[in-house]
Swiss-Prot record:
GO function term, MF aspect, one: structural constituent of ribosome
Official protein name in the record: Small ribosomal subunit protein uS14B
Domain of life: Bacteria
Cofactor(s) demanded: Zn(2+)
Length: 61
């Protein structure tokens, strides 16, 4: 889990556009965020396995 202070810091608008970065909307993780879903890989995987993300299913071939 991300620190509450870091999540609060990210909510503020930065002085420069370059300073913005993505965070997982579910857990607040700053790394490996899938932009389309705004989720980190871990949360994305959990929700995909549960079938809670429409149009996403586990690949099998």
């Amino acid at each position: 889990m991300a620190k509450k202070s870091m999540i609060a810091k990210q909510q503020r608008t930065p002085k420069f556009k370059v300073q913005e970065y993505t965070r997982c909307e579910r857990c607040g993780r700053p790394h490996s965020v899938i932009r389309k879903f705004k989720l980190c890989r871990i949360c994305f995987r959990e929700l995909a396995y549960k079938g809670q993300i429409p149009g996403v299913k586990k690949a099998s071939w």
